[in-house]
Amino acid sequence: DPVDIGKKAAEKTLRRLNPRKVKSAHVPVILDPRVSASIVGHLSGAINGSGIARGTSFLLDAMGSEVFAPHINIIDDPHRKRGLRSKPFDAEGVANQKRHLIENGVLKTWIMDLRSARQLGLKSTGNASRGAGSLPGPSTTNPI
């Protein structure tokens, strides 16, 4: 309904008028799903095995370190029921599994395909994906 959309847009605009500074504090925050998806997308890029192997990730030396608040857990679940990218194997035929990327705020793993795993001296995590005309590369499946 165009009228309803207009009303919601006006309400959002009015709420942003007359901003004011607030004192610094530790407070709980609720993020819009789009913002959360963006944060997870940036995390996925930062823990991508290719970037780690090239030395270009800002999380290069963060394995085992707290990179989020202690109550944050991010899981990549390639077997999630009705997940858009659910599959038993990655694009290179490597079996995949549900894996904690972030557990209690701590970085637990890189996402790797065979190539990046070989470059890092590690095993593939079964996270290779590919497009129709591209080589495989590391990618998350269904991050939650």
Task: Outline where the language-model segments fall.
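N-terminal small-residue-enriched
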Residues: 1-144
